[in-house]
């Protein structure tokens, strides 16, 4: 069984589903994406994504017209496998098409671009043996880039808050449940991180705080303070 948390950007709410590995992902139409496919190589019992990521998948799948193999999707930040600001940790990124021909990957990429639903579709020249697309959302905290995570603060709700909570727990700054809600305890934990790395302790996770926190937590493995 897996616990799947879905953030709905339209209502700013998070919903939790308890599903088996062969169940369809919430909001994915038909059986086009099962929990085990979204999980990929992650060993986490808890997964998360957004309604808009699933909608983008649905549009791409319909436009392409047949099955799309998913090589990698979800990862928790302490599991690593991707960069320090990867959208895979937010549950909105997919690396697909590893088992088909180059021409078929081009067709998948073209379908993804044509939907206009993804925040980013990687050029085929950068990923010639797979297709990458993600449904990033929010304005990146660091200026001059379209990558990275948005600023989150007390009252924020999102899968980016889930990344923050997961990193704080893994590093032992807090033991908050993974609910995707930035509350007072999370604010205090962010201040503790900021003090530890000589940043202004304002309790807001912006550009520099994200950089320090993700660099310290990405790929460190499951620690004794990780919470599922």
Locations of the language-model features?
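Intrinsically disordered, low-complexity
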Residues: 1-42, 139-159, 166, 171, ...
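Surface-exposed helix-capping loop/turn segments at secondary-structure junctions
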Residues: 66-68, 173-177
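Short loop/beta submotifs within extracellular cysteine-rich repeat domains
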Residues: 175, 197-201, 220-221
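Mixed-charge, low-complexity intrinsically disordered regions
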Residues: 208, 225-226
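Catalytic cores and adjacent binding grooves of peptidoglycan-active enzymes
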Residues: 4-7, 84-92, 98-172, 180, ...
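Short, surface-exposed alpha-helical recognition segments that flank or form part
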Residues: 44-48, 156, 177
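Cell-envelope/glycan interface and biosynthesis
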Residues: 5-127, 131-135
């Amino acid at each position: 069984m897996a616990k799947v948390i879905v953030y709905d950007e339209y209502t700013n709410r998070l919903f939790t589903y308890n599903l088996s590995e062969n169940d369809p992902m919430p909001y994915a139409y038909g059986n086009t994406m099962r929990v085990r496919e979204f999980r990929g190589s992650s060993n986490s019992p808890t997964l998360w994504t957004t309604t808009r990521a699933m909608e983008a998948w649905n549009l791409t799948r319909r436009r392409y017209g047949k099955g799309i193999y998913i090589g990698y999707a979800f990862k928790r930040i302490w599991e690593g496998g991707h960069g320090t600001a990867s959208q895979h940790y937010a549950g909105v990124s997919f690396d697909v098409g590893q088992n088909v021909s180059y021409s078929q990957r081009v067709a998948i990429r073209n379908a993804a671009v044509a939907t206009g639903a993804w925040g980013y579709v990687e050029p085929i020249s950068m990923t010639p043996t797979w297709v990458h697309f993600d449904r990033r959302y929010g304005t990146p905290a660091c200026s001059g880039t379209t990558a990275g995570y948005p600023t989150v603060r007390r009252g924020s709700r999102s899968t980016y808050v889930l990344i923050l909570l997961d990193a704080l727990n893994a590093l032992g700054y807090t033991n908050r449940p993974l609910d995707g809600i930035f509350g007072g305890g999370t604010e205090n934990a962010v201040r503790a991180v900021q003090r530890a790395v000589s940043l202004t302790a304002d309790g807001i996770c912006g550009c520099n705080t994200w950089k320090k926190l993700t660099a310290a937590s990405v790929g460190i493995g499951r620690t004794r303070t990780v919470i599922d």
